[in-house]
Amino acid sequence: SVVAAYLYWGGSGSAIDSNVVLNGSGVIASRTFTATFNNGGTNFPYFGAFADVTSRVSGNGSFTFTGLTVNTGTPHCGSSAVAAGWSLVVIYGSPSERLRAINVFDGLEPFRGSALNLAPDGFRVPATGIDGRIAVVALEGDPDNSTPLNGVSEELRFNGTALDDGINVPGSNPLLQFLSTTINMPVH
């Protein structure tokens, strides 16, 4: 059964689009995020938004997202920096699954060409039988912006070790292009 369902969306521009459509019904953001990436003296503003849509998600199904407006002009277009995307994060429970602690951390942080170090807390870890998973929702991620910049590759590391999901999309390197616009885990 669905315990919680969270809709995240965002894109390029300083005008936050806080009203979108999920499966034909309007959704209004309850939280928004903004961040600016500076590249060579040019500021690239981005926004993100969140809404709890648990009441609209009852189980497996197809979901359609529309109505997102982003800046596709200057300065984003000239630098291949236009971004738009959405993700539905669903937390479910089942008597056949073992008990798990679920932590959802959100925000918006640009990091191209620089390292972004996060130290999430609040985890409860058993002494044995550790079976952790991580999911990341990211904007951008096209191959043109996935090459190393300033000696920093697009990769996800845990305690210094680059993570590889073992899924190799043709033309990508999962260790160096972690944000390659793919869904890298099986859907349950």
Positions of predicted regions on the chain:
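Helix-biased "structured C-terminal domain" signature
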Residues: 35, 45, 84-188
